[in-house]
Structure formats: structure tokens, C-alpha cells
């Protein structure tokens, strides 16, 4: 069933959206111990269906007492219908563990809608004031970051106003912090600034700590991205400012005055509405260790709702990836074995939905619905102490003579042999922008299967590092990705592992001299196969810095093609790239990369590739001109051109008609994404593109100056290869090593951003700047190299 897509609607009725479990499990034998919980129960009761407990704490104490160290038959904790407003998370330790044959089951009653809520109800007496703004007193000490009225998410007073049709942030403004606007704020302390990274590589969040004079604010925060930069000059907004409360559905909490302000829609009396405010970050917590794990527990049929936003706590760097993280989620799992989380709903959450933290083995996260989430959906994150010679920023590295060169992990404190399958994930990253549907960092042998992921600000699936590989990523349907950021993919990975160095020259020397370093961390091959990916704002599959030891086959790429930046041992075959193709960037001399038997619809878009790996050949083209362009590069000797006669492209079936399996082999293109009936009826599908046989874009103008060949940065590929924050600047393509420019420090691959104080966006800017400053014999230029700005003085 194809459903219409909305991008990030936040004002959403969610009161009746949680799962209703309809006999997920059959009746158990009479020996099963059943413990009941009801919103009308009491912890002084017996826990029976006629005398239920009121809390999960009481039920878990009953489990512990019943077990008392003995082997027992199966135990079920059954929530009866209702909303359970928790005042603290439900904690489960090893003492309540089940067994392989009799797991502890925590579930909703058959047919019951059960909500675990992290919010508290607000008892408010509203009084109408000026300009349509109502006010109500709250108890001293009350604080919250999000608010709901009759199950509708309300908007914290903000500028610019919320617009669900605008990305990013549902509204942004370059003047959000302008002196003129700041001057109108009497006391902005506690306000929040949300902004994209200058390169749109995720986002930042800052708290306003006060004013410096009349028209400037002071800020703290901005630690939510592991690639520090200034905030984006345009993509930013402010919230939690009283003076910005100026439109319907906005609210503002004055903590000093203990007063809540709200502007309802015309004709609405807020005294007739039910208000709740999220308080808890976590609703269920499984906590064990490798020596004493929580094990054999199943959680099903519950709806996790209303957790508090956690964006100001996102600060821990995940090795040298672009991410920082906050280790928390509505469902938090650490030190668990053989536990299953099935057919639950995670809706209207302020932070992460599910966090699998450090040591975990044999977990299954399956059949869940995850939507309207402030941060990420499913996160598998290990302990950096398990990594040998870790580094924690792009520009950091461990010198070889200090490096631990033992292969593999240092400890077992990371997720391994876990599965995330058949999950429906969409409309996440509503607050934080460096998030993913499934995030993997410092983990091994995960199975990410049959998930449907869409409407995300960045990647649908992200693998942050090579430690320790062995993942299977298959049968997923991932689309509407990278909607609010840039230079990324529907699938994205980094591999800044032990061999990787921020200076390319040093990395080349290191990997040539010590090739054994390459797979010290990525010890197992990660397989990406039989997925459907679509990214209209980047690449469908993006293996970025250092990503190594991958096998990629049988994937249908609908828009952005496939990119391999520098890395090793990538075998890519039998993929279909609609209206796009292959993007190799800055390859190593001995990469051992293979790209063969794929269908491409444009010539290879290589950038700074001198060496073509082990094999780039036997690929299938739709146009003779594209093949000839690639053959002129010394590759694709046995490439072929055929008529791309697809079976049923309008319905996404891009198998070749009457194909005899000559090299390329047809594969199933009709069964991606979720498989459970419940989720299939709720899921959307990607827009299927019409195949267009188009020539690759004509290369832009080139200009020779002082023995150097220059051109404008014109494509996303050129931007990504250089690590630029935007498609701007002038790229140096060729340079005579005997020239003055070379002696002045310029190198091939440098991007000129500024010449003698003149901003350089394209080639004509550089030409005009040189003419303007023709008398300057030592002009200063600002260049971009190794993803950093450098200033050089040219000796002309």
C-alpha cells in the first residue's frame, strides 16, 4: 500500500496511534505465572487479573520473589489497557531474567492499548491576557522542554514561526540572532539556538546564557557535532524566547515566574484541554554486564511515548566519525543477552528511541514502529575502551610508533550478533540532525534487515567506523533521506580507523609501508545487498573516508548512485543505478577495489583518481558515449552497451527483460522493507523515477594561469571529494611542479576560496580578482586542503 508522504509534520494527532496487540502470542500453558498491572490497581494487591498491581516495580519484585533463585516455569507481566505515567524508568536487572525455554515476557493484554508515558499531567487554571495569550501558574521548580495539549505537540515560542513545509527546521532565518532582533528580547536567558553545521554536516544546539550589551547574546553548547565549525549563517532559528510568542499553538514557560503562557487557536479555551509535559528521558532500562547479563526477556505490544528532549546532552564523540552521541533512549539496553523487543511503538519522543549500549549479545529488535522522534531511532554503540588506539576527532591520530597493532577489539564491551529487522522508521531527527534510522558504531556482526526508513534529516543507515565489521545490511527500503543536511547518503559510512590519517600524503605512506594496518579494525566483511536506496540530496550509497572491507551487491539505487571515497577492499557488483552511476573519489594506489557487472546510466564520475583498483570493468551502459568516456581513462575494456529494456520500471521493477544472466544477474526488486502485515499497511514507498538516458553533464570551463589549470567546483561529487561545506570555490586540476604556484605551496586538488580578500565562488571570480589585484606580487590566497582552510602567500 502506497501512502502519501509528509516531511516532518509536528502538530500531529497521536492519541489513537499506538499499537493494539491482537493476540500476538497464543495462550500459554496453565503453568505460566501471570502478573497483571492496571492503572486502577494497587501495589498492595496480589498481582492477579482481579487484584492487579499499579506499577511495573511491584510486578518485577513479585517476579524476583517468585523465582527466588529457583528454576521456574514461564512468567508473564501483563499490562492492562491504559496510559501509565511513569515517575521513574522501569528498571530490569539480571535477577528477573528468564531462560531460553521460558523467557520473562512483558506485554500488553490481548487487544489492549498500553502507553508508557514519560510525561506528567499539568493542573492548570488559565486566564486570558492580551494579544490572545493565556497564562497559568505552575508549581515552583517546574521545567520542561516540550508540551502537548490533547495529544497534539505544541510549538515552543520561536523565530521564525513553525512551517511544516519548510526544511530545515520547519523554518529558518539568517537574522535569527541579528542585533535588531536581540535588542527586542528583554531576558532571553534559557533560549535555544538551533543551527546547521556550516557545511550542513548535521546540526548544533546552543543555550542562551544572557545578553552582552543590548544586542548580542552569550551562548554555550554546540558540542553536538564531532566536526566543529561555526553555525550556518542562514539555516538557524531560536526558540524559548517570550517575545517570539506570536502565533497559534506556541507556548513559553517562564521558570522564574512559574508561569506558562500559551496562544491557542481562535475560539479555543485552554481550560478545556489536557496538558502533559515530558519529564523522563528513559522509560525501560535493562541493565546488566558481560559477567552478569540480563537475559531472556521479551517486551512486546507496548507504546513508548513522551520522553524529554536530550539534545543539549549530545556530546560524546564517536571515534573519528562526524557524530557525537548521548547514551540514552526511551528503551535503554546494556549488558543484555538473548532479549527480544517486538511489535512495540515508539512515538513522540524527545531523544533517541532505542539505545543498545556497550556489551550486548543476541538481541532482536523487530516489528517495531518508530516515528516522531527528536533524535535517532535504533542505535548500536560500543565502548571506545574496547577499541585499540582510538582517536576522537577527524584531525587526531595515533602515531605509528605508539599504535597498538594487535588485530580486533581490546575488550568485549560492544554489541555483537544483534538484529534490527522489520522495523518501520520515519520522521525522526525532528530536533537533532546528526541521527540515523539505524546507527552503528563500535559493533560487530549486526543484522539490519527488512527495515523501511524514510523522512530523515541525514542517513537512513549509518556505520560510523570500521570497528569491527561483519554486518549484514539487506532487504531494507531507505528513501527520502538527507532532507535537511548535505554531502551524505541514504546509506553512509566512515572508516577512519587505525590506518587512517587526516593528511593524505602521510596516509598513503603509512598504508604502503604497513598494509597490515588496513584491516586491523574492519576485521570482518560487511555485506550490503538486496536493498533499495534513494537519496536525492547526496548518494544512494556513500562509503566515505576510509570505509573498507565491504561487499556490495544486488542493490537498487534510484537516484544518487554509488560513491566510494578512499578505502580498501570494496567489492561492488550486480547493482543497478537508475539515472546515475559510479562515483570513485581519491582512491589509494593499492586499494584492491572491484567494480564490475553493474548497470550504470552515466559515465563514471571519478575525482582525483590516478589508480583504478583491482578491477573496474565488465559494467553495462545505456549509452555508447558514456562507455567511450570511461574507456578513454584506460578502464572498462570489456564494458558493454545494451538497450536497457526494464521489466516494469513504472512499478520499480528494473530487471532486464529476456536477460540471459551474462555477467549481471537479475535480482528480486519487489520485496524491500518491512514484512509484517501491521507495518506494511502503515508504510510508504519511494517515488519511482522514470529512466532517462542522459549524457553526463558537460565539463565546465577550464582556465590556465601560471602553469596551473583551474575550474569551478560545480558538482556535489567535487564538493565531497574536497570536503567542502558547499559547492563553491575554484579547483586546481593540474600544476607544473616547477612553477611559482607550486613553490608557493599550491597543490593539485586545492580549492581556492579567497584571493587577496576577494571571495571566490567560481572561476570568473578568480579571474576578476587577479585582474583587480594585478599589481600584488605576493597575493594572499585562502585554500581548502585536507578538509581545512589554509592561507598561502603566492610568490608570483
Where are these regions (language model features)?
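Short glycine/acidic-rich loop motifs that flank beta-strands on beta-rich extracellular proteins
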Residues: 88-89, 281, 308-314, 350-356, ...
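Beta-propeller domains
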Residues: 223-230, 239-240, 266-292, 305-308, ...
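C-terminal recognition in membrane/secretory proteostasis and scaffolding
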Residues: 686-796
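Predominantly extracellular beta-rich ligand-binding scaffolds that present long acidic/polar faces
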Residues: 87-94, 101, 105, 549-651
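Extracellular beta-strand solenoid repeats
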Residues: 78, 85, 91, 105-107, ...
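Right-handed parallel beta-helix
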Residues: 295-306, 337-351, 361-375, 387-406, ...
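Extracellular polysaccharide-degrading/modifying enzymes targeting complex plant/algal/animal polysaccharides
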Residues: 32-335, 340-345, 386-410, 652-656, ...
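Bacterial Sec-dependent N-terminal signal peptides
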Residues: 1-32
Amino acid at each position: 500500500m502506497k501512502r502519501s508522504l509528509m516531511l516532518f509534520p509536528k502538530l500531529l494527532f497521536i492519541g489513537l496511534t499506538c499499537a493494539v496487540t491482537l493476540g500476538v502470542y497464543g495462550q500459554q500453558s496453565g503453568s505460566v505465572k501471570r502478573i497483571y498491572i492496571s492503572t486502577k490497581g494497587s501495589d498492595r494487591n496480589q498481582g492477579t487479573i482481579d487484584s492487579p498491581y499499579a506499577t511495573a516495580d511491584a510486578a518485577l519484585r513479585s517476579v524476583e520473589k517468585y523465582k527466588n533463585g529457583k528454576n521456574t516455569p514461564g512468567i508473564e507481566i501483563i499490562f492492562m489497557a491504559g496510559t501509565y505515567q511513569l515517575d521513574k524508568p522501569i528498571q530490569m536487572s539480571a535477577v528477573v531474567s528468564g531462560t531460553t525455554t521460558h523467557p520473562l515476557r512483558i506485554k500488553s493484554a490481548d487487544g489492549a492499548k498500553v502507553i508508557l508515558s514519560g510525561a506528567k499531567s499539568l493542573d492548570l487554571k488559565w486566564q486570558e491576557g492580551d494579544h490572545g495569550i493565556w497564562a497559568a501558574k505552575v508549581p515552583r521548580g517546574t521545567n520542561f522542554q516540550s508540551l502537548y495539549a490533547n495529544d497534539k505537540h505544541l510549538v515552543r515560542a520561536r523565530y521564525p514561526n513553525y512551517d511544516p513545509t519548510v526544511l530545515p527546521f520547519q523554518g529558518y532565518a539568517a537574522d535569527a540572532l541579528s542585533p535588531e532582533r536581540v535588542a527586542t528580547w528583554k531576558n532571553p536567558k534559557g533560549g535555544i539556538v538551533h543551527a546547521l553545521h556550516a557545511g550542513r554536516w548535521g546540526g548544533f544546539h546552543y543555550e542562551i546564557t544572557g545578553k552582552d550589551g543590548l544586542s548580542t547574546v552569550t551562548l554555550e553548547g554546540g558540542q553536538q557535532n564531532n566536526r566543529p565549525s561555526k553555525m550556518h549563517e542562514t539555516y538557524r532559528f531560536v526558540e524559548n524566547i517570550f517575545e517570539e510568542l506570536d502565533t497559534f499553538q506556541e507556548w513559553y514557560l517562564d521558570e522564574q515566574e512559574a508561569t506558562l503562557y500559551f496562544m491557542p487557536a481562535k475560539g479555543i479555551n485552554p481550560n478545556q484541554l489536557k496538558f502533559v509535559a515530558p519529564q523522563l528521558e528513559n522509560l525501560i532500562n535493562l541493565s546488566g554486564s558481560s559477567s552478569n547479563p540480563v537475559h531472556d526477556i521479551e517486551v512486546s505490544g507496548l507504546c513508548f511515548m513522551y520522553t524529554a528532549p536530550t539534545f543539549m546532552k549530545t556530546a560524546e564523540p564517536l571515534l573519528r566519525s562526524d557524530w557525537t552521541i548521548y547514551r540514552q533512549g526511551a528503551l535503554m539496553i546494556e549488558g543484555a543477552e538473548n532479549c527480544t523487543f517486538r511489535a512495540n511503538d515508539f512515538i513522540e519522543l524527545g531523544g533517541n528511541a532505542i539505545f543498545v549500549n556497550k556489551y550486548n549479545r543476541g538481541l532482536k529488535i523487530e516489528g517495531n514502529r518508530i516515528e516522531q522522534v527528536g533524535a535517532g531511532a535504533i542505535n548500536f554503540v560500543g565502548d571506545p575502551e574496547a577499541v585499540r588506539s582510538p582517536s576522537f576527532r577527524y584531525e587526531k591520530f595515533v602515531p605509528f610508533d605508539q599504535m597498538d597493532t594487535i588485530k580486533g577489539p581490546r575488550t568485549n564491551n560492544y554489541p555483537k550478533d544483534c538484529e534490527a529487522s522489520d522495523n518501520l522508521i520515519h520522521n525522526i531527527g525532528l530536533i537533532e540532525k546528526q541521527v540515523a534510522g539505524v546507527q552503528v558504531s563500535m559493533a560487530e556482526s549486526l543484522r539490519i534487515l527488512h527495515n523501511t526508513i524514510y523522512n530523515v534529516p541525514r542517513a537512513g543507515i549509518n556505520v560510523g567506523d570500521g570497528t569491527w565489521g561483519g554486518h549484514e545490511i539487506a532487504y531494507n527500503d531507505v528513501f527520502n533521506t538527507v532532507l535537511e543536511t548535505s554531502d551524505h547518503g541514504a546509506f553512509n559510512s566512515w572508516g577512519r580507523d587505525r590506518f587512517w590519517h587526516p593528511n593524505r600524503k602521510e596516509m598513503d605512506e603509512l598504508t604502503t609501508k604497513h598494509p597490515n594496518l588496513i584491516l586491523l579494525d574492519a576485521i570482518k566483511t560487511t555485506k550490503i545487498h538486496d536493498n533499495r536506496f534513494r537519496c536525492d540530496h547526496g548518494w544512494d550509497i556513500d562509503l566515505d573516508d576510509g570505509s573498507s572491507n565491504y561487499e556490495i551487491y544486488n542493490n537498487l539505487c534510484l537516484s544518487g548512485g554509488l560513491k566510494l571515497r578512499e578505502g580498501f577492499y570494496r567489492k561492488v557488483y550486480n547493482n543497478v543505478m537508475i539515472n546515475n552511476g559510479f562515483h570513485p573519489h581519491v582512491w589509494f594506489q593499492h586499494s584492491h577495489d572491484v567494480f564490475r557487472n553493474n548497470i550504470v546510466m552515466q559515465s563514471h564520475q571519478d575525482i582525483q583518481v590516478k589508480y583504478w583498483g583491482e578491477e573496474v570493468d565488465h559494467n553495462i551502459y545505456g549509452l555508447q558515449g558514456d562507455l567511450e568516456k570511461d574507456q578513454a581513462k584506460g578502464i572498462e575494456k570489456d564494458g558493454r552497451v545494451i538497450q536497457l529494456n526494464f521489466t516494469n520500471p513504472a512499478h520499480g521493477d528494473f530487471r532486464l527483460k529476456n536477460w540471459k544472466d551474462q555477467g549481471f544477474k537479475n535480482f528480486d526488486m519487489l520485496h524491500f522493507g518491512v514484512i509484517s502485515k501491521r507495518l506494511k499497511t502503515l508504510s510508504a514507498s519511494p517515488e519511482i523515477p522514470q529512466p532517462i538516458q542522459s549524457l553526463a553533464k558537460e565539463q565546465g570551463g577550464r582556465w590556465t594561469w601560471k602553469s596551473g589549470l583551474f575550474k569551478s567546483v560545480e558538482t556535489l561529487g567535487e564538493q565531497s571529494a574536497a570536503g567542502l561545506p558547499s559547492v563553491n570555490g575554484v579547483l586546481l586540476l593540474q600544476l607544473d611542479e616547477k612553477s611559482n604556484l607550486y613553490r608557493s605551496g599550491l597543490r593539485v586538488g586545492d580549492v581556492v576560496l579567497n584571493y587577496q580578500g576577494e571571495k571566490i565562488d567560481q572561476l570568473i571570480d578568480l579571474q576578476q580578482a587577479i585582474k583587480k589585484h594585478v599589481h600584488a606580487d605576493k597575493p594572499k590566497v585562502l585554500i581548502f586542503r585536507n578538509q581545512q582552510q589554509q592561507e598561502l602567500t603566492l610568490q608570483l
